Design a protein with these regions (language model features):
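A short, charged, Gly/Pro-tolerant segment at domain boundaries
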Residues: 123, 129-148
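Glycine-rich phosphate-binding loops that contact phosphosugars or nucleotide phosphates
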Residues: 2-119, 126
Length: 148
């Protein structure tokens, strides 16, 4: 399961799409067809500034249901990272409304964090492909939507 909002959410949704291309069962929390979450499930949440209330709420509910919570953030001092997450992945890049000591950027708002998310997620995908015998980009492309 994945969750994010705004442009951070778009980067996270792109990650979910690639996981689906790999044949993984993946659900975007906001979709109406998302099943219940529970024991043995993983929720990956992106929240740049660490203070997105409704994402914190969903992470708390998922944790209560038995899911593991991984948080990718530019602000590890946020409530979700400190109080809910099982694992925190700190991306030290400027985020929208961020307050932590991170790599500054002249780009507007949270661009640097969003760009770093996309690169991080692509590296994770490439690593999984490299470490999965028989998984190729050609096989992944067979799971690409074919009604475009």
């Amino acid at each position: 399961f994945c969750i994010g909002v705004g442009r951070e959410g778009m980067m996270t949704r792109a990650f979910a799409m690639r996981l689906m291309h790999m044949g993984k069962e993946i659900h975007w929390i906001w979709d109406d067809t998302t099943p219940s979450i529970g024991e043995g499930d993983l929720l990956i949440a992106t929240l740049g500034d660490g203070r997105i209330g409704h994402i914190n709420y969903i992470c708390e509910r998922a944790k209560e249901a038995g899911a593991m919570i991984y948080v990718v953030t530019g602000s590890p001092s946020g409530d979700t990272a400190k109080n809910v997450a099982d694992k925190v992945f700190f991306v030290p890049a400027a985020v929208y409304r961020g307050t932590d000591d991170v790599v500054p950027s002249f780009q507007p708002m949270g661009n640097l964090f969003e760009q770093c998310l996309l690169i991080l997620f692509d590296i994770i995908i490439m690593t999984i492909v490299d470490e999965t015998p028989g998984l190729t980009f050609e096989k992944m492309s067979k799971n690409h939507r074919n009604v475009e």
